[in-house]
Amino acid sequence: MLFRSVAVLMAEGYEEGETLTIVDLLRRGGLECHTFSFNEEFVRGMHDMYVKADKLFNGEIKNYDMLVLPGGRPGGQNLLENQDVISLVQYFNEHHQYIAAMCSGTVVLEKANVIKGKKVTGYTGYQDKLVSGDFVNEVAVFDQNIVTSQGPATPYPFSFKILEVFGKDVTEMKEGLMYNFAGGK
């Protein structure tokens, strides 16, 4: 099996629970997963947790198999307002690379114009913000090259969906994490 790599963007105000859970589960699942910050080595999350990013945002990201956009306030908005992020999302889409976004990070996909005709989901009430996609009320959705999820309570199913996109069987991981026991499906 090919080795797969994932780049997770950490904008100031990122949602810690989403971001750190995603990174943890993808690494447990055997993917090469790196976090990227924009200006500083340490990035402040929306609940004032400072986390050291693995790398600074650069052109190297284009070599990754997947780009992940977590949410957060103002993390999602900071991603949305960054033209380099919009251009990177468009690049990934044009080159048929995977893009994953959750919560407020999903609006970046709309602005980048990469979800037209694709099933997507996002934070509660985001139907009006994801108008070019086919909004569905599901926890995690994969359509063509796009993975989306709803919000702070959904990074587990989101991460499992990403692992499955890369051909990973998550059955044992779910058992080891007691995910099904805790009510996960």
Task: Give short role names for the model-derived ranges.
Residues 21-22:
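Short amphipathic alpha-helix
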Residues 35-47:
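Membrane-interfacial amphipathic helices and adjacent loop/beta segments
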Residues 4-10, 14, 25-38, 54-55, ...:
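Active-site-adjacent pocket-lining segments in enzyme domains
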Residues 46-55:
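Short gly/ser/thr-rich secondary-structure transition/capping motifs
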Residues 1:
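Extracellular interaction modules
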